[in-house]
Amino acid sequence: MYTSPVIGGLLFALVMLFLKITNLATITLDTTLQNLFMTTFFASVGFTASFKILKNGGIKVAMFLGIAILLIISQDIVGATLAKVFQLNPLLGLCTGSISMIGGHGTAGSFGPLLEELGVSGATTVSFASATFGLVMGSFIGGFVAKGLIDNYKLKTPKESHDKSIPLSDFHEDNQAVLCQKRLMKGSAFLFLSMGIGSVISGFIQDTGLTFPSYIGAMIAAAVIRNFCDIRKIEIEEKEIEVIGNISLGYFLCIALMGLKLWELFDLALPLVVMLVAQSLLMAIFAYFITFRAMGKDYDAAVFASASCGFGMGATPNAVANMDALSAKFGFAATPYFVVPIVGALFVDFVNSAVITLFINILM
């Protein structure tokens, strides 16, 4: 259930951990290409956003956002409650809650220093360590949850339906696919065009003072280009764009996971380890019993459940990696591929920041 980049990246992180512990060497990674690969992948996702998919995914966006809000609140309640049980500052519990789980390293870097200013010692370290833990666990939990749902509920998958109109994500295993330089060049051109226009869009967004992921501009531009081409009946090299996007996702995840500082987890005291395990159990139970049922109890819902594990314990790319692993084995689910990045990029950061701020004021 796990993609090769995830396994390879984690193995390299373990090697770095060994070198760190034994003081044999210190490796510093150059992650210059990480954002490029991330932007390329999400631009490819934007090209799937035709009006037809938007129409089908409209209500799903609202539903998935509602589920994400409930998850945010649940994570913060669990974190603060367990902190009180261990006689720790409940604000420190928030560092193992949505600050680091659904917020990831970005939110951890924002709220950690703020909590330290409020007198919570070690908040930044705990936030980053928890986010690192979540990044690792989100990938593992997502696979187990989805496999359990598909097996236990005997869900019908696209590959089982033998419906040739349903695209399969794992294009590189399509034995009938023909590699064509012209189509690859056109697909690359569409991606580069969307990324160029997207950089301008992202610049305008930054000028407003709002905080968005760097890839959102490229994804919006790609969606506009896709729908313009649909209206003008201009052919889009969908398969080639998808392949380039999936390759970029693999490289991005590998680089990101290679840079994990696993030794940061050693600095966590037993109470914090217990809180992180509790967050992992919460995520698995939440995805299995709430996300799956709320999103329709079908194959798409299982993909949503798997994505929510990566999304709820790390970052949107982790969620997409979980979906990609499922799509490669069982078939493509179009709606989750569009809904999850949109919710993760456009809405969750705002809601999460508001909920965290509310909890901070309540617990102070």
Model-derived segments and spans:
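Structural signature of multi-pass alpha-helical membrane transport proteins
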Residues: M1-T31, F47-S50, D170-E173, M185-E240, ...
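Small-residue-rich segments of transmembrane alpha-helices in multi-pass membrane proteins
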Residues: V6-M16, L65-I77, S98-G103, A223, ...
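Hydrophobic alpha-helical transmembrane segments in multi-pass integral membrane proteins
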Residues: L17-I21, D76-K84, G109-L115, Y251-E264, ...
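Transmembrane alpha-helix boundary signature
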Residues: L17-T28, G46-G57, I77-P90, I231-R232, ...
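Structural signature of hydrophobic alpha-helical transmembrane segments
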Residues: T28-F42, L91-S98, G209-A221, I244-G245, ...
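Entry/N-cap segments of selected transmembrane alpha helices
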Residues: L36-T39, F51-A80, S188, M258-Y288
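Alpha-helical membrane segments and immediately flanking helix-loop junctions
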Residues: L82-V126, F133, V145, D298-F347
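Intrinsically disordered, low-complexity non-transmembrane regions of multi-pass membrane transporters
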Residues: K147-S188, D230-E235
